[in-house]
Amino acid sequence: MTTSTAAKRTKSGCWTCRLRRKKCNEGGPPCDNCEARGIHCHGYGPRPQWKDRGALEREEARKLQYQSGRGRSYSRSSSTAAAAAPKPAEGAMVTGGSSSSSRGSGSSIYVGGNGLGGAQEEQHGDNNAPFSAGTGNFEYQANPAPGISPLMSDIDLALDAHAMDPLDFNFDFSSTPSSAVDKSSSTSADSPSFTSIECSQFPIFSPELTVDTPVALFPQVAPIPPGLPGRESVPVAACTDLVISHGLLLEEMDRPVGQRHGQVMAEGEKGIELMMRCPPAPRAPRLEGQGRSAHILLFVRDWYAASSWRIWSGNIQDCQNHIDAAASLLLEHETALVGEAHRLSNMERKALAFFTVRLIWNDVLLSSTRRTVPKAEMVYRRLLLADSNSRGGDSHTTTSTTGPTTTTPLLAASTFWDLTGCEGAVLLAMLDASILSAWRLGEEASGSLSIRALVGRADKIEAVVEGEIARLSSLLPRSPEKTSSASGKPSHGRKTGPENEVTVATVHSLIFAHAILTDLHQTVSGPRASVPEIGDSISRAISSAWNLWQEQQQQGAGLGLERILAWPYCVAASLAKGDQREVFREIIARTENGDGSSSGGDVQQLKSIVEQCWATSSSNHRDWKDVVQRSNQFGVFLI
């Protein structure tokens, strides 16, 4: 390092982790602390430009620290707490826009830490500005909370279970997303579309969590911006690892869809490019135990987010590649995750369950539509079996006949039921049906298809599905198959009361079970609506759909379930005939007449897929899966 450079230096040590008395030059080998954390080491030298946030930014951070009202009581030195006082506290803020002084240099995002990701700073708009990521090989800066030494890395904090438990962060589980948004305020009078949101006001996890709930499971993942056309479930909020600007998305809400899509996707592509540079597995020996599980969790989350971006952009192959990458992590580290799950905090465990369930859901539905076998099929099977076996009790251990023992701290009982409204047993049957469809496709290609073997395998799956239908029907206040007309409309209203929430999920699973039967018959007999078994299964599916629809109206629940029901809707509606088609037309019409909260783009895609199948004659019916693949409309099925 030259003398002139040394003269400009105001502090000695590493600018990234603040490790004092570093013996290497800037651009040289990384320091031990940075190497252990797996982040890019800045070295030392003159104060980097990005270190000076300015007086306005510091004042805003100090104000938000007071607003959060959630101080931490840690046994750290008072001098360290005083040094870290100007930094944002645990209740992180997501600043979509910036004040008038920072508008020219781009927006800044501050995201709170939870002992894993840490509080990080991300800047956009400047080509030379660094990007931060919890596990990436690029620039990183920790904003230590009061009472936490700046010399400690975020993974050090995670590993220090005795000194600090992530659950001690006192996140407010009782507050709702709406209340948090109400408390948010604009950071600039001239940018009303930008808001600052206190992420600590959002529940980290809720037992009533549904796929459309805008909730931050990790402090690094900010709430999903409402009203994003067609993709409410895409994690398009301020995720530091994917470098997605929450403010940019909010600003783009008022722009035409075409213009908004281009700019938003540019941010997503930039984030995915940075994420691809991250190492696929922990490199340092310190990342063992809880650190390794947390590292895998971050990658499962990021690969899921990347797949959502890809499916939104219509790149189905890249979406499948990202899903396969996340599935490979689960496949490779399944034993470690199961064995070390007890070391994860309650919040981390539930976050892992959330992203794993969504990954399995998307992979199974995508495989069914593409007639392929998921890469991590055996892992999915074990997790789905564990969820199914523990559905009715509180047992924490269940043994599968197809694999090793699976422990529910990884995926707790009723996880699929709570997060998707569909039981794991039903999704397991869909996985089996998808594997059967892929098997037939391969046998036909090789010219060795045995109809007897095909029917025999289909009968085994059908017997399991019929058993699930009988069990689910017994849970309903009134059987959904007792109707007053052939159209499938129920003759009596359903019960009202606190059990309605469970009833909705039961009918939801029932719809999928009937659709799996229809899909099985289609695999064996082809897409022919004239097959009696297909017509009968569609009539039963109509009854379940009407019960769910009536329950939805009684509950006053918002629309938006059409993406979850997209797969069974296409299976049944595409092969419907006569009066059955009128029922599905009415279902679409009711969805289109909603209050605008539903994803109209998805509804139009469903309508287009089904009408293309109806346009052909009954003797030469078109398979809806072929329509989806040709039109590249896979995104309508994924969450």
From Swiss-Prot:
Keyword annotations of the record: DNA-binding, Metal-binding, Nucleus, Transcription, Transcription regulation, Virulence, Zinc
Lineage top rank: taxon: Eukaryota
The keyword DNA-binding belongs to this UniProt entry's keyword annotation: yes
Transmembrane domains' residue ranges: none
Pfam family membership, one: Zn_clus
Family matches, as InterPro entries: Fun_TF, Zn2-C6_fun-type_DNA-bd_sf, Zn2Cys6_DnaBD
Region (Disordered) residue spans: 58-136, 476-499
Extent of Low complexity compositional bias: 68-108
A single Gene Ontology CC term: nucleus
Predominant subcellular localization, coarse grouping: nucleus
GO molecular function, one term: zinc ion binding
Localization (cell): Nucleus
DNA-binding region: 14-41
Function according to Swiss-Prot or TrEMBL: Transcription factor; part of the gene cluster that mediates the biosynthesis of the phomopsins, a group of hexapeptide mycotoxins which infects lupins and causes lupinosis disease in livestock. May play a role in the regulation of the production of phomopsins.
Protein name (record): Transcription factor phomR
Phylogenetic placement of the source organism: Eukaryota, Fungi, Dikarya, Ascomycota, Pezizomycotina
Gene that this sequence comes from: phomR
